[in-house]
Amino acid sequence: MPTHIEPDELCRVPVDGYEVVTYSYGSGDNILFLLNGGPGLPCDYLRDPHIFLAEEGYRVVAFDQLGCGKSDRPDEPSLWNIARYVEEVETVRKALGLEKFNLLGQSWGGWLSIEYALTYPDAIQSLVLANTCGDLPHLTTELNRMRDALGSETVAMMLHHESMGTIDHPEYQAAITILNYRHVCRL
């Protein structure tokens, strides 16, 4: 459970007709803009690192991306694409008056950070990637290879549930549990 501490600054930023909630910790001149994992996770699971880095003299800025945490949660599938997320980050940057900053992307936030840095390189002082992947086509190939090892019947079942939008079905979830145990966390 993350440590609870009130942010030094909390803002609501308009994005695409909705609002996202931003959090700032610390007041140093060295800014660390953190993009967390997900998509769909609020940034609070990284609260302890926010606090630690603020205590080390950084101003740490994070936000609940659209669709999660305390930000608005629109039910609009057209919003969920990487280009729009990149523009969301840029909108937040401008709204908070951030010039050059250090960008840290964790997990999904790493993918987003790479795209943001390629689109807005002049805003970036440094880029740190944590627990992420830099080559999505390779990742997709490897994930499919791992899934194929479950056998043709299981793969057919998974593809069926994915096409039907029923990935919450118990047999699909059982297959995901096996994949996660074999390839993500073996505890």
Locate each region found by the language model:
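Catalytic nucleophile-loop/oxyanion-hole region of alpha/beta-hydrolase
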Residues: 74-86, 133
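Conserved HGGG/HGGXW glycine-rich cap/lid loop of the alpha/beta-hydrolase fold
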Residues: 18-74, 78, 93
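N-terminal cap/lid segment of alpha/beta-hydrolase-fold proteins
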Residues: 2-19
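Conserved acidic catalytic loop of the alpha/beta-hydrolase fold
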Residues: 83-101
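Active-site acidic short loop of glycosyltransferases
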Residues: 15, 27-29, 94-100, 122
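Flexible "cap/lid" loop of the alpha/beta hydrolase fold
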Residues: 126-166
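Conserved hydrolase catalytic core segment
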Residues: 99-142
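Alpha/beta-hydrolase
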Residues: 159-187
